[in-house]
């Protein structure tokens, strides 16, 4: 866990936001609290923030500031305020984004409220109501979380404004009276910020209290094993929240990696320049001497015109050339650490400046020779200092490259960890989504069975009301017998059905059949498909349900033309795996809602019986009196 970052206010308790431990979240909520990175350190040493004794009445405590002091302070204040302004802008951007999320959260909460009202008004299942109640609690907590986040950003804004005023008060260009006025404004803004801190802290505490209630509610649901979808929804929402937070963190980590990579590139360029500078210094004549005096001796020579005037005997001008040569490491080191005079005396063993009667001339020549060594010494010292400075710059650059390399590694490791977390979240989400889909499938399956049972019961009731108890019992018995059975061949079915058809034609004429055909034209294809699916479920048909409205079309043609083979061929193709229950389900779905009358009922039931069990044809005959 990262260390809490705090807003430090003199004389007031601080409000701390822990970016991990206090992250505003609930079962499905991941609201990022404001990152209080503006005030993680103390104000500049020169700041009057928390130290209002810098003014002594109407006079400066210290001596009046110099122009240099004023300009230095101006630069410090400008740099400090620029930093605060950038952080304030970032804070405002975050607040704006939080405001957008709050608006979306309010809309989501209102939608959940309306959905819950609709479910309650419609007498929905208790599980669905429980699930929606839990969703509403989540939505309410999310909304409050964003309000808490915004309160934190508002507190940060006030703190920043306070520090800017304190910084303005520290200008050396204003009078003590003006400074005092600014400090009073800053103190007022600071007090407002502290009040905002308390408000945000109270809201955060309230948020945690509400979150605890929601967590407890979730635990109860999990413990009781009820409202499985509500539990899975909560787990899904939690992971989605983690995913959102992870995506933001990945974006920040990538930006961080890009930034440190650019810093590393800059550091490497600086190292290259430092190495080039060192090479350049070492390749100068004097630089070469510093590196290898044996290979590149250091030389210096000067032409002189020395005037001698003291002794008339030697009066005149002496023209000489002084020279100095360093061609080994020992002499070089000695010269660099001693004077030219010491070198001449101790290394060259030239201790006596006067060697002739011309004392004045000898001394001036000696001094010129000493000066030549000092001249060479200074050149070599300058070269050595430049090389040393370049080497120091290289060491510093290498250290910087090493630090930036480590920083890049840490940033890359952090990004990889977040990417790994992202994949883990994705995997968990996939698992949760699969479980949710399975729970919904189970719920839909249960609801479909309920609907199928109700539809079948309503169908039998309708048959009873329209055609009597015998017809209703016939439908029930045929449905029962068809379950788990296979249909006969088309030829066998036609043979059985022809007996019924021949008897039927003796009693009913073409006008009766045309009335049935007309009724079949009124079949609602959509309703038929829905009913077929439910009847199939009720009769235990587990194969793939195929919508075959064209079978009903063939039925209509057969009734009209009395040519039944095409119909039976189509009906056979309907029964996947030759399942008799599919044929029965189709027949019931055609008759439900279609005014086929007792004759149409008899024809359809006889056709199904011919395919399933022709013993029922006799019952159909009795039903219509043939």
UniProtKB/Swiss-Prot annotation:
Residues 276-308 are annotated as: Disordered. Belongs to the channel forming colicin family. GO terms for biological process: defense response to Gram-negative bacterium; killing of cells of another organism. It holds the Pfam family Colicin_Ia. It is found in: Host membrane. The chain crosses the membrane at residues 588-612. GO terms for molecular function: pore-forming activity. PROSITE patterns: CHANNEL_COLICIN (PS00276). SUPFAM superfamilies: Colicin, Colicin Ia, N-terminal domain. InterPro entries: Channel_colicin_C, Channel_colicin_C_sf, Channel_colicin_cen, Channel_colicin_N_sf. This is Colicin-Ib. This colicin is a channel-forming colicin. This class of transmembrane toxins depolarize the cytoplasmic membrane, leading to dissipation of cellular energy. Residues 276-286 have a biased composition (Polar residues). It comes from Escherichia coli. One of its GO terms (cellular component) is membrane. Keywords: Antibiotic, Antimicrobial, Bacteriocin, Host membrane, Membrane, Plasmid, Transmembrane, Transmembrane helix.
